[in-house]
């Protein structure tokens, strides 16, 4: 299903994130995939970035449309951002992707 989102979904990006979005009919809640490549840093740094992304998505969950599958890909520049910067950058790219209500 990840591959289907990559191949047929629409993409949006900013300096720190790429988001692929695929609408899914009759889905009660959104589903998300998070990808953080090795260029971001070692395993500890990558897990830290994933935690920050998950926390940001958790805060934004009420504003995200429920009938979507989407994948968030972190670019290497994300490793230097604080949690608040990750939140604002992620919110920006999700608005570009028209994921927000």
Put a short name on every predicted segment.
Residues 1-101:
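Positively charged, solvent-exposed patches that mediate nucleic-acid binding
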């Amino acid at each position: 299903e990840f591959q289907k989102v990559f191949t047929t979904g629409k993409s949006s990006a900013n300096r720190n994130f790429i988001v692929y979005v695929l609408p899914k009919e009759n889905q009660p809640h959104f589903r998300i995939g998070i990808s953080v490549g090795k260029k971001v840093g070692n395993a500890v740094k990558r897990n830290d970035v994933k935690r920050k992304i998950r926390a940001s998505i958790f805060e934004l969950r009420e504003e995200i449309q429920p009938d979507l599958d989407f994948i968030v890909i972190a670019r290497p520049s994300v490793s230097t951002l604080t949690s608040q910067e990750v939140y604002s950058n992620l919110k920006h790219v999700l608005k570009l992707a028209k994921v927000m209500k």
